[in-house]
Amino acid sequence: MEKVLVLLLVALSVAYAAPGPRGIVINLEEGELCLNSAQCKSGCCHHSSALSLARCAPKASENSECSPQTIYGVYYKCPCERGLTCEGDKSIVGSITNTNFGVCLDV
């Protein structure tokens, strides 16, 4: 009985000592360095220029500039929040040159 009690106390102390949900590789907060949007809590890995480091950023709100979601997962402009659509250039040239920015609209 005494061993069971000690084991229970050890298990509880380990459970309380475990770190919170903050991640090192995934579940990153806004402003932390990222390589892909899947790593960010917000769902957007953003960089301002080709030479800048990408950081997690909030998704674009209504009437803000946006980029359509891509398979690459790193954006110059973040995609729209849930329920909004990015209305803008949908050409192949725009997606190749990364100039296919639009505006988030509630359609």
From Swiss-Prot:
Residues 1-17 form the signal peptide. Residues 18-22 form a propeptide. Expressed by the pancreas. Gene3D superfamilies: Lipase, subunit A. One of its GO terms (cellular component) is extracellular region. It is found in: Secreted. Forms a 1:1 stoichiometric complex with pancreatic lipase. This is Colipase.
